[in-house]
Amino acid sequence: MQTDFDVIVVGAGPSGTAAAFRLKRFGYQVLLLDKQQFPRVKPCGGGISIKALNLMPWSVAPVIERAVKKLGMGVSSRATERYEVFEAQGYVCTFAVREAFDNFNFGKAVEAGVEFEHSSELSEIDERGDFVRATLGNRTITARYLIGADGANSTVRRLLSAGRWFYRGFAMEGLVSYADVGAEPLAAFFFGKVANGYGWLFPKGDHINVGLYTWDNTVTLSKEQLRAYSIDRIESDKLERIIGFPIGFGGRNYVQNRERIILVGDAAGFAEPLLGEGIHNALKSGQAAASAIIAFDDGRSSSLRLAYKKELGPIHNDLVRCENLKSFFYGNLAGIGYGALRFPVSKIALMRGFAAGKTMYELTNTFFLSPLFRPAQPPALYAHCER
């Protein structure tokens, strides 16, 4: 059947733009849908790991506001609080405002020829043999494939009645102007500030992103908790734009229940639960979905399900490892969990791994090779925003 497009991508965040851009490069006609116009406000801590930067098909240096070689890591318990500075020779993390980061990537996809449509009216998805039909308001559009990249509260996942594997974690953030604090703090994680999670301080260009995270959906985060954490860490309760948001987990058990419809990123639960990072696996799964479609069309796989499962192999391995580490680390936080983290050999390996852009699966499998790891990002690229 002749369809309107080759691929419809629902959601224009990191996973959606990654998929759309790769498909367009291979000659596919792609429609990118999003319920919001760009630029749009997107709640997120805005930490962009080196492993995520390594996946980008273009430099995002213009929207990076801080690049750091040091991270503060602390742990709080009823009995005590401990804190140390972890340092590497190369950048271990960068920070951006998600509104700017997403808009930059969206612009690159549109520049490449991806067609965009603003629509919040997706109400039905129907797979019919060799094509997919999507209903938008009072009209329908067709494509050979559809990719759901619409986040933790995915409409695509809901319409498919999919996601028994899926669960949500939560985060809450607020912004504090540098004018309201004495000095710019070190980028830092404070584990144990909330149950089964941590508090963060992420410095940006003119403000600090202050936040709380938990992978445990039985834990409630509140504005009062966030203000108390901000007062405790930077002696300021002047938080602006406080907002909570879900994070999609459970993707280690992702099941594709349609042949021509794929979920990616948080819609598939591909955020890793150890630290709650979602951008790396969003990019990687978006690219994986595109590669799976291309492989299936080229006859290199007998089904799209098998092609996507193969492409997801590295993500699956890392999610399993992060789930196991999550259980060990947070379950023994005040004792051996944080103790293992700050053990000199672990400390060095961790920071070298971060700087080299290693996943947790790669890092733990090559732990004793960490002296051979080299920083992945050129120093000159982010010298303008190094702190």
Where are these regions (language model features)?
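Predominantly flavin-linked oxidoreductase catalytic cores and closely associated redox partners
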Residues: 12, 108-237, 253, 269
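A conserved beta-strand/loop capping segment in the N-terminal third of enzymes
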Residues: 49-104
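Hydrophobic anchor at the start of a short beta-strand
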Residues: 7, 28-30, 146
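C-terminal helical "tail/cap" subdomain of flavin- and related membrane-associated enzymes
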Residues: 291-387
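FAD/FMN-dependent oxidoreductases across multiple families
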Residues: 124, 217-293
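Beta1/beta-strand and adjacent pyrophosphate-binding region of the FAD-binding site
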Residues: 1-13
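Glycine-rich FAD pyrophosphate-binding loop
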Residues: 21-43
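N-terminal Rossmann-fold NAD(P) dinucleotide-binding loop
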Residues: 16-17
